[in-house]
Amino acid sequence: MKNTFSRLFGFGDKESEFELQDESHEEIAKKVYEEIQEIPIVNITPNRYQPRTVFDDARIEELALTIRTHGLIQPIVVRQYEDDKYEIIAGERRFRAATKLGWEKVPAIIKNLNDTETASVALIENLQREELTAIEEAVAYQKLIELHNLTQEALAQRLGKGQSTVANKLRLLKLPEEIKSALLEKSITERHARALIPLKNEELQLKVLQEIVEKQLNVKQTEERIAKLLEEVKPKRKAKQKAVSRDARIAMNTIRQSLQMVANSGLNVNSAEEEFDEYYQITIKIPKKK
């Protein structure tokens, strides 16, 4: 059975091109672990394709304590991009923990990968850990789509996820930066953010975001608030006006002018006009006595 990494390392549209077809797990493992070195930490840089933008300092501290006690059991994975310069492919949390411990060198597996492969490994390695925020996950999906020229459906198949899951994550990227930041900082949940999408209007979205944070609205309260706002901004349907023929307008104006002439003669005439779907009705009351 081929692993997720092998299915995603490739180019073009055909699924076969995303797979390492003729290599066993043992051969792949041999390639991965063929070179381990102690590399100076100052010569290592974070992965430019790292989808994770928020690192929990408390958890890094916990990891550092574990490494101090048991050592670094799993080396980080890097690639060399210049003489004595290395970029992390996988294991940035371990790298940060080792740095926190004051290590001068860290054991690393050196792999020969190009930019596309490096990005794919970094993105998938983080996606598999399921520790990313919803926005970080959405960014990872978008980068994989761009790197491999995939459709949402194709990406979902390769990750073993439903297409709706991928689509819902990607919709979050259309939200204003303030809302995406709130998601990253975990001030709101993914369901809060998804509820804001139908508003469309950025000003309204930010207004509701402020209400969610300040009033600690739960998801149901947020959805009810948004439903009310959508009802308020819904354009009112104008009553359909039927076209009035030229002859009808002439007739109405003639009657009005005649009534005005009678009134000018000193006779107190009362009239009332009513408009129906198919006709106008004019009621005229003329007193018998002046």
Swiss-Prot record:
It is found in: Cytoplasm, Nucleoid. Disulfide bonds: none annotated. Gene3D superfamilies: 1.10.10.2830, 3.90.1530.30. One of its GO terms (cellular component) is nucleoid. The keyword Transport does not apply. GO terms for biological process: chromosome segregation; division septum assembly; positive regulation of sporulation resulting in formation of a cellular spore. GO terms for molecular function: DNA binding. Transmembrane segments: none annotated. Keywords: Cell cycle, Cell division, Cytoplasm, DNA-binding, Septation. InterPro entries: Chromosome_partition/occlusion (IPR050336), HTH_ParB/Spo0J (IPR041468), Nucleoid_occlusion_protein (IPR023705), ParB/RepB/Spo0J (IPR004437), ParB/Sulfiredoxin_dom (IPR003115), ParB/Sulfiredoxin_sf (IPR036086). NCBIfam families: nucleoid_noc, parB_part. Belongs to the ParB family. PANTHER family: CHROMOSOME-PARTITIONING PROTEIN PARB-RELATED, NUCLEOID OCCLUSION PROTEIN. Effects nucleoid occlusion by binding relatively nonspecifically to DNA and preventing the assembly of the division machinery in the vicinity of the nucleoid, especially under conditions that disturb the cell cycle. It helps to coordinate cell division and chromosome segregation by preventing the formation of the Z ring through the nucleoid, which would cause chromosome breakage. This is Nucleoid occlusion protein. It comes from Bacillus mycoides (strain KBAB4) (Bacillus weihenstephanensis).
